[in-house]
C-alpha cells in the first residue's frame, strides 16, 4: 500500500515516502521537514514541464528498480528531473549516455538543447564535449536548432579561434541563418515597431562584430555588398569591410589602430579553415594491414599570408605521418666530453612531423623592410582527427599548435603525438579501416591574438 500520491500533469502516481526519501535529498527535505507544508500531505502536486511530465513515470519507477530506459529524446527531460530532485546516480547515468551519443544528438537536431542545458547546470564535461562538436562540425547544426540557440551561446562560440570552417564566409552564412530564425521569432512578439527595429539592429551589429571580415578575400567581400543585410545596415557593414580591405592591402598602421579597440582585438586572427588553400586531408586506407612503424609522406603548399599582398607566393610543406607509432632504435650520442648510449624507445601513438621546405633565408640588401615583415614563417597548425560515433562521421578531436619556422628551424617538434593508437571510433569507412587526419596551416602576423598552444579534445 502506498502512503503518498504524487500528481504530475493531472495524473496521480502512488509512491512511498520511505523510497522517495532514500532516493532523493529533495524529497527527503520536502517530506520529512516540518517546515514544509508537504510533509503532512497525502497528495502532493508537482509542477513539471510537459516534457518532464511525459517521462515522470519512468523517473519514479527508477526509484524502485534502479533501472530506466533512456533515449536521445528522453535523456534531457530525465536529466532535468534528476537535477531538480538531486538523484545523483541518475544524473551520472544520463550524463554518461549523453557523452556517448553527442553525434546522434546532432544528427537528430537536439545537440543545441543538450549543450545549453549542461552549460547552465554546470555539467562541464558534457557541456565542453557538446561545444567542441559544434565548433568543429558546424555543418551539423540544422535550421530547427538555430531557433533554440540563445544569443549569449552564439556570441560565446563566435569568439573562439578553433572553429573548424571551410572559410570565414561559411561562418557569415551561419550567422545569417541564425538571424533569419530570430527574425521569425521577433515578428511574433509583442514588441512595438520601434522596439522591434531597435532590438533587430542591436542583434545584427552585436553578432556580426565577431565575424572576422579581414579573413575574407576581396571577391567574397565584394559579394557581400550585394546582400540585402548589407544594404539594410550599410553603415555598419561598410566600416567592417573597410577594415577588411585595409588588411588585404597591407595598410599596417590602420590595422594596428583597429587592433587596439575592444571590438578589433580578434579580427585579424584566423580560425581553422579547411579549404584547399590552407591544408590537406591525409587519408590512410587499409589501416589494419599496415606494418608497425609505417610512414606516409605528404607534400602540399599553402599561401604565406591571408591578405593579398603575397598572393603569388606559396609555402611548401612536407608532412610525415606515422599511423602506427615510431621505433627509435638504440643509438650512441657522442659529445666532446663523453659518449652516451641512447636506449631504444617505442612510441605507439599516432604521430605527425611537419617540415617547412622553403623558409625564407636571411634578408638581403634589396629586401624592402617593413617593421611588420618577418623573415620567418609563423603559423597556427590545426590537426583535425576524424572519428565516427553512432554512424556519424565527424571531426572528433583537434590538436592546435603555434610555431615559428625559420631557415634554422624548419621542423615543428610540437606536432608529435596526435592521439593514442586508433580505436574503432577513430577509423572510418564501411570496413572501419580508414584513418583520416586533416592538416590545417594558417599564417599568423603580429596582429594575431593567440594563446598558449594546447591539445583539444
Put a short name on every predicted segment.
Residues 64-65, 338-339, 367-370, 421-426:
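Eukaryotic intrinsically disordered and solvent-exposed regulatory patches
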Residues 13-15, 23, 41, 56, ...:
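Alpha-helical scaffold in the C-terminal half of BTB/POZ domains
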Residues 386-432, 442-457:
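Beta-rich interaction modules in large eukaryotic scaffold/regulatory proteins
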Residues 3-5, 9-11, 33-36, 338-343:
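Beta-strand elements of modular eukaryotic interaction domains
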Residues 45-47:
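Alpha-solenoid helical repeat scaffolds
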Amino acid at each position: 500500500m502506498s502512503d503518498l500520491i504524487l500528481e504530475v500533469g493531472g495524473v496521480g502516481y502512488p509512491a512511498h515516502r520511505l523510497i522517495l526519501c532514500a532516493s532523493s535529498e529533495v524529497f527527503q527535505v520536502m517530506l520529512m521537514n516540518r517546515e514544509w507544508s508537504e510533509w503532512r500531505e497525502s497528495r502532493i502536486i508537482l509542477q513539471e514541464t510537459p516534457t518532464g511530465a511525459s517521462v515522470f513515470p519512468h523517473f519514479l519507477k527508477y526509484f524502485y528498480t534502479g533501472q530506466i530506459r533512456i533515449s536521445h529524446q528522453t535523456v534531457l527531460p530525465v536529466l532535468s528531473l534528476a537535477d531538480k530532485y538531486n538523484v545523483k546516480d541518475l544524473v551520472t547515468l544520463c550524463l554518461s549516455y549523453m557523452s556517448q551519443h553527442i553525434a546522434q544528438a546532432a544528427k537528430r537536431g537536439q545537440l543545441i538543447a543538450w549543450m545549453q542545458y549542461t552549460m547552465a547546470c554546470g555539467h562541464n564535461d558534457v557541456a565542453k564535449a557538446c561545444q567542441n562538436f559544434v565548433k568543429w562540425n558546424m555543418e551539423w547544426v540544422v535550421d530547427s536548432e538555430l531557433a533554440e540557440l540563445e544569443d549569449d551561446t552564439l556570441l560565446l562560440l563566435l569568439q573562439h579561434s578553433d572553429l573548424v570552417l571551410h572559410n570565414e564566409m561559411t561562418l557569415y552564412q551561419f550567422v545569417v541563418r541564425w538571424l533569419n530564425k530570430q527574425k521569425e521569432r521577433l515578428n511574433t512578439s509583442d514588441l512595438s515597431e520601434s522596439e522591434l527595429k531597435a532590438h533587430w539592429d542591436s542583434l545584427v551589429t552585436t553578432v556580426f562584430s565577431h565575424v572576422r571580415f579581414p579573413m575574407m578575400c576581396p571577391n567574397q567581400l565584394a559579394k557581400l555588398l550585394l546582400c540585402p543585410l548589407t544594404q539594410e545596415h550599410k553603415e555598419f557593414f561598410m566600416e567592417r569591410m573597410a577594415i577588411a580591405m585595409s588588411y588585404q592591402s597591407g595598410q599596417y598602421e590602420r590595422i594596428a589602430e583597429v587592433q587596439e579597440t575592444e571590438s578589433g582585438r580578434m579580427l585579424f586572427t584566423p580560425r581553422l579553415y579547411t579549404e584547399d588553400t590552407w591544408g590537406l586531408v591525409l587519408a590512410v586506407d587499409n589501416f589494419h594491414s599496415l606494418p608497425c612503424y609505417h610512414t606516409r609522406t605528404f607534400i602540399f603548399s599553402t599561401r604565406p599570408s591571408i591578405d593579398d599582398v603575397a598572393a603569388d607566393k606559396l609555402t611548401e610543406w612536407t608532412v610525415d605521418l606515422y599511423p602506427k607509432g615510431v621505433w627509435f632504435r638504440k643509438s650512441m650520442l657522442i659529445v666532446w666530453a663523453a659518449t652516451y648510449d641512447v636506449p631504444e624507445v617505442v612510441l605507439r601513438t599516432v604521430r605527425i612531423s611537419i617540415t617547412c621546405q622553403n623558409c625564407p633565408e636571411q634578408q638581403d640588401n634589396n629586401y624592402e623592410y617593413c617593421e611588420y615583415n618577418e623573415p620567418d614563417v609563423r603559423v597556427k597548425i590545426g590537426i583535425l582527427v576524424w572519428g565516427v560515433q553512432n554512424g556519424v562521421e565527424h571531426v572528433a578531436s583537434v590538436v592546435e599548435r603555434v610555431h615559428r619556422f625559420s631557415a634554422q628551424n624548419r621542423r615543428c617538434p610540437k606536432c608529435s603525438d596526435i592521439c593514442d593508437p586508433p580505436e574503432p571510433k577513430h577509423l572510418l569507412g564501411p570496413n572501419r579501416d580508414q584513418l583520416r587526419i586533416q592538416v590545417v596551416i594558417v599564417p599568423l602576423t603580429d596582429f594575431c591574438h593567440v594563446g598558449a598552444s594546447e591539445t583539444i579534445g
